[in-house]
A protein has these predicted regions:
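Conserved alpha/beta-hydrolase catalytic His-Asp/Glu region
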Residues: 151-152, 166-219
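Catalytic histidine-centered segment of alpha/beta-hydrolase-like enzymes
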Residues: 256-270
Length: 280
């Protein structure tokens, strides 16, 4: 069973070592060998991979990436399938995780020092750890739903059918942006990239997000995992985090009473650095 604790830190992202942002796109390769589109920040000796939330993109983790790069990490930021700038439509969390494992095998030596994910990205990270138990030395799993919500899944298609035609309208985009509590400077990329997501992909990844189930293989996970959840998240998210901590023997559960869904990745980058460095 994982350890538990409570923390209330808050800091701003470091502006050091921003460097040039590298982008990789796949060439003309067979479908079964399609590579994930990635952005890379930093040139440190240690490697971290961070997986963004559903409906967002790599910039979800820009604050964390800046801080990690300033502290000796090379940070790889994949774009999940079905999102703006990705190389293919969204199919499943399991397939995204398989692509991630292949990416780490092909380009990062088969193992990374740190693996993190938030929401949908956290589910992909968990699936990668289930598929390859020692793919990372440390992991941060933030706001991961691992208890299926069947009713929510059934409502995804009709909800998207109603809201999707409004995505490009500024008033709707601004309302959605405000509901997510994102930093103001992210509005432009948020609006641009949310408009680029197809209706089919939006339905697909929202359905997968609401139906993902905790995998028994995580009991053998070799990464030291920190599981983050906010007290202002829906109760099922807190229950998911606690179930995950029980399922992963070498994990630490940290519940932040006043935090919302995905807040650490956006507003508290130091939490990731501390977890990856093994600090309390």
């Amino acid at each position: 069973m994982g350890r538990t604790g409570r923390e209330e830190p808050r800091a701003h992202a470091s502006a050091q070592a921003r460097g040039s942002l590298q982008r990789r796109r796949p060439g003309n390769v067979p479908v079964e060998r399609i590579q994930m589109v990635t952005h890379t920040l930093g040139t440190g000796a240690r490697t971290a991979v961070l997986l963004h939330g559903g409906g967002l993109s790599w910039w979800n983790y820009r604050a964390v990436a800046d801080l990690l790069a300033a502290n000796g990490y090379r940070v790889v930021l994949p774009v999940l399938d079905g999102h703006a700038g990705s190389d293919r439509p969204f199919t499943s969390i399991e397939e995204n995780a398989s692509e991630l494992v292949a990416l780490i095998d092909r380009e990062l030596g088969g193992r990374v020092d740190a693996l993190g994910g938030v929401s949908l990205g956290a589910q992909v990270a968990l699936e990668a750890l289930a598929q390859r138990s020692r793919i990372a030395g440390r992991a941060v799993i933030e706001s991961a739903l691992v208890l299926p919500m069947r009713a929510a899944r059934a409502l995804v298609a009709p909800a998207v059918a109603l809201s999707y035609p409004l995505v490009r309208r500024p008033w709707f985009s601004q309302a959605q942006f405000a509901s997510l509590h994102l930093p103001e400077e992210l509005y432009e990329p948020y609006h641009r990239d949310s408009c680029a997501i197809s209706k089919r992909d939006m339905i697909a990844f929202m359905r997968e997000n609401s139906s993902y189930r905790l995998k028994p293989e995580l009991a053998g996970c070799g990464a030291r995992a920190t599981i983050l959840v906010g007290g202002k998240e829906p109760r099922i998210m807190v229950r998911s985090a606690r179930a995950l901590a029980k399922a992963m023997p070498d994990s630490t559960l940290v519940e932040h009473p006043g935090w919302r869904h995905g807040e650490a990745s956006l507003w508290h980058p130091e939490v990731y650095l501390e977890a990856f460095e093994g600090r309390p």
